[in-house]
Amino acid sequence: MTNSNLRTENHFDYVKITLASPDRVMEWGQRTLPNGQVVGEVTKPETINYRTLKPEMDGLFCEKIFGPSKDWECHCGKYKRVRHRGIVCERCGVEVTESRVRRHRMGFIKLAAPVSHVWYLKGIPSYVAILLDMPLRDVEQIVYFNCYVVLDPGDHKDLKYKQLLTEDEWLEIEDEIYAEDSEIENEPVVGIGAEALKQLLEDLTLDEVAEQLREEIAGSKGQKRAKLIKRLRVIDNFIATNARPEWMVLDVIPVIPPDLRPMVQLDGGRFATSDLNDLYRRVINRNNRLARLQEILAPEIIVRNEKRMLQEAVDALIDNGRRGRTVVGANNRPLKSLSDIIEGKQGRFRQNLLGKRVDYSGRSVIVVGPKLKMHQCGLPKEMAIELFQPFVIHRLIRQNIVNNIKAAKKLIQRADDEVMQVLQEVIDGHPIMLNRAPTLHRLGIQAFEPKLVDGRAIQLHPLVCPAFNADFDGDQMAVHVPLAIEAQTEARMLMLASNNILSPATGEPIITPSQDMVLGAYYLTALQPDVQPVDFGDRSRTFSDLEDVIHAFEDKRLGLHDWVWVRFNGEVEDDDEREEPVSSETLSDGTRFEQWTYRRDRFDDDGALISRYILTTVGRVVMNHTIIDAVAAT
């Protein structure tokens, strides 16, 4: 015995969207109750009773079809409580179960006349027109009851299969057929509306048509060949998916679950409802009226007009505004159809399925973080404490700072120093991923080591901006925390910003300094024309090492473009092309001084270098010192 309420995991390889047959649509909505009654068909346009505020039976919110609106309670109230689980009430026919079944149980409307599916008729390209090899204008004339189409020419010599006839032309032919001297034995058959379209589609034998098209393609070229290939491709797709062309004409339309098109009561006693309910109501009203007209054998012109109105109602339900006048509600606002709910940026796919919010993620504005290393980013403490909360709670309990989760959460809310210390321990070595939409290539999401910062903005290293196509004029970025050890390892090994220096598209470096970085490097190393070099020996401008120069600059004893003499024993490259020094002096102890334009060297009597002072600017010392520190750090 299996419990139907248990969640079962179904593993599948892919989801395929294909045409649904009328039988499949009936299967979605039809259920057989234990007493043998078959439910699922929505026959009434009513939604809820205005006095009892309960759903109307066989209406758009029917509890018998879609399930109870209250957990474990039938419509009439005979059965209440969970102990009656699975029982179907004998009085009202409602199954006693959870109300959440109203989110997935469907119904259906059996149409009194077939209607064309507007996606396949008015889509680009029009699959109905391609399959029938007819102009779209002609197909529309048939569907919307403007022209007859010849389904069988019979013995009439002037008629051809699929030929269009106006009302007057058909009346003339009818007079001719039924004349006393008529020689036509096999009468021609014509049709109009979606019924005629369905007949034409049923007459198609896809395999034979595909074979015939392949033969025609072999002997044709140019525009005709392209048209034949287009038609063959559509037919091959129908064959591959085991779909029949006549399924593009609907005999049954599904009614989506009521909790996906809710009706809620507002404060003033009025109701707010989904637009779909209004669109379904129009379809049901027109369908019921058509069925009644057919029962009483109403004149053909009235029935035909009702069929056209039913076609327009179903068109509006599926895709409002695609053809004809847009159906509007209160305040002349167009009603949202099924297509509007699915498509676009705010549609179900892009808004709720592809772009859904996930746990362990955050979002904030980015600002420049020039003091960061390239593999680091500044993460606001407020965000970090929220993103890493489970890790912090675990560590607080493990270190016996608190005894339970509730106490840990209270401590975190107070943001004590020990919490911040634990947070720092947690984020050390735990990479986070930053993503900037739109993620157009793989470098649109990269991993960084977080550094806790004050404020509410994420700090980003300026060098990684080209990869994200980011700038600091209000751009926002999303933060994601990889949880599993495998995910953290992958993020560190493959996605760390410092490991993604080359563009995957071109192979050229994408980490290139630009804008203020280039300007800053230029300003730091530029020579000011109005600042004169100093002579060697000026004690205020002579320093024993690079650190002393930087200290003097930080103490504001020197400006960024001031000239200084600084001792430096490394290799020096300069633009001095002289072969001989400016001056040379040998002392009594054998040591020798050589004065060049930008350096002063001292050699012993064997010619070995004892010391070297170079003439440079404070900015160049800062630049050199920064590069040396960066290289040493790696």
From Swiss-Prot:
GO CC terms of this entry: DNA-directed RNA polymerase complex
Family: Belongs to the RNA polymerase beta' chain family. RpoC1 subfamily.
Swiss-Prot/TrEMBL keywords: DNA-directed RNA polymerase, Magnesium, Metal-binding, Nucleotidyltransferase, Transcription, Transferase, Zinc
Protein name: DNA-directed RNA polymerase subunit gamma
Family annotation (PANTHER family): DNA-DIRECTED RNA POLYMERASE, DNA-DIRECTED RNA POLYMERASE SUBUNIT BETA
Residue numbers binding Mg(2+): D471, D473, D475
Catalytic activity from the UniProt record: RNA(n) + a ribonucleoside 5'-triphosphate = RNA(n+1) + diphosphate
Function statement: DNA-dependent RNA polymerase catalyzes the transcription of DNA into RNA using the four ribonucleoside triphosphates as substrates.
Cofactor: Mg(2+); Zn(2+)
GO terms for biological process, alphabetical: DNA-templated transcription
One GO molecular-function entry: DNA binding
Binding site for Zn(2+): C74, C76, C89, C92
Subunit structure: In cyanobacteria the RNAP catalytic core is composed of 2 alpha, 1 beta, 1 beta', 1 gamma and 1 omega subunit. When a sigma factor is associated with the core the holoenzyme is formed, which can initiate transcription.
Annotated InterPro entries: DNA-dir_RpoC1_gamma, DNA-dir_RpoC_beta_prime, RNA_pol_asu, RNA_pol_N, RNA_pol_Rpb1_1, RNA_pol_Rpb1_3, RNA_pol_Rpb1_3_sf, RNA_pol_Rpb1_clamp_domain
